[in-house]
């Protein structure tokens, strides 16, 4: 009996020690709030300077405008209105952000990655084809669904994902991410529109393409910015 108790105690201690090494992508707040400020005379924490708590107002936690449709008159036929720490400074250290996604018929957010956050989306209007691809550990498996109003889909952190309007009307969705600043890496923009450009000969070999095709694609991606506001 004594040996069993010692074993259980040792196991609990190991679990507690292991939990201290768990890494959070957005650290937990160390105070009630830590509103972002561009000032340089404050203590630097969690990636942003903190505003003097005595100067914080309700507006630091407020944004108005997600009811306004985004402009989908672009090459992709889509628009993302991000509401992250840059628009709501009170999100600093809270580990969340939200966005409105608008899609014209046939519009899409092409394959991209959020390097610092998992994501969940809720379709409000229209029809969306969404999905993500697993890593090489799981043989690049595609997980995809057709979503309709009221449907929800989750995307793991750091995996390639996409969203496309496969319906005949405009589509609208709300996306929530687990970071105040999740970042976005559109695969096409990063590979073919980097600054400076990657040597087209390297990309031609990597993607088994003619080098002239690579140069053409680079011209397309380097001349147009991504549609995230």
Swiss-Prot record:
Q: Where does Mn(2+) bind?
A: 112, 114, 163
Q: Which residues form the Cupin type-1 domain?
A: 64-215
Q: Which UniProt keywords apply?
A: Apoplast, Disulfide bond, Glycoprotein, Manganese, Metal-binding, Secreted, Signal
Annotated site residues (Probable non-functional manganese-binding site) in this chain:
119
Which residues, if any, are the signal sequence?
1-24
Q: Where in the cell is it found?
A: Secreted, Extracellular space, Apoplast
The GO molecular function terms of this record are:
manganese ion binding
Q: Cystine bridges: which residues?
A: 34-50
This protein is called: Putative germin-like protein subfamily 1 member 2
> What is the role of the protein in this entry?
May play a role in plant defense. Probably has no oxalate oxidase activity even if the active site is conserved.
Q: Which PANTHER family match?
A: GERMIN-LIKE PROTEIN SUBFAMILY 3 MEMBER 3
Key word Glycosyltransferase present in the record?
Answer: no
Any GO CC annotation of this UniProt entry: apoplast
Q: Which family does it belong to?
A: Belongs to the germin family.
Q: Which residues are glycosylated?
A: 38, 71, 139
> Which InterPro entries does the UniProt record give?
Cupin_1, Germin, RmlC-like_jellyroll, RmlC_Cupin_sf
User: Assembly state and interactors?
Assistant: Oligomer (believed to be a pentamer but probably hexamer).
